[in-house]
């Protein structure tokens, strides 16, 4: 469960290491984001020669949460931390690699590219 001011790790090779959620997209009173939701993030920590710089604002999709996601069969998939993948204005991934597992809930038409790049889909 991600809300404003939440810190997330970055699960791609854009050069960003840590981001902070500054807005949950999808409605004026929307408070929380879960796996597969698009959020607006600010880069808080970045590698020196990465594609992105500290302080820049991007869209991102949440790929892992400590809260987890409940499946139709009753199982619950949780992770150790929260992670996101940075997106451009067209909601396409900026990076060319994804680190760590992602969930099957991302297998929508919007994020098939992320699922295909991921090393493991849970």
From Swiss-Prot:
One of its GO terms (molecular function) is structural constituent of ribosome. GO terms for cellular component: cytosolic large ribosomal subunit. GO terms for biological process: translation. InterPro entries: Ribosomal_uL14 (IPR000218), Ribosomal_uL14_bac-type (IPR005745), Ribosomal_uL14_CS (IPR019972), Ribosomal_uL14_sf (IPR036853). Keywords: Ribonucleoprotein, Ribosomal protein, RNA-binding, rRNA-binding. Disulfide bonds: none annotated. It comes from the Bacteria. Coiled coil: none annotated. NCBIfam families: rplN_bact (TIGR01067). Binds to 23S rRNA. Forms part of two intersubunit bridges in the 70S ribosome. HAMAP family: Ribosomal_uL14. Belongs to the universal ribosomal protein uL14 family. Part of the 50S ribosomal subunit. Forms a cluster with proteins L3 and L19. In the 70S ribosome, L14 and L19 interact and together make contacts with the 16S rRNA in bridges B5 and B8. This is Large ribosomal subunit protein uL14. The lineage of its organism: Bacteria, Pseudomonadati, Pseudomonadota, Betaproteobacteria, Burkholderiales.
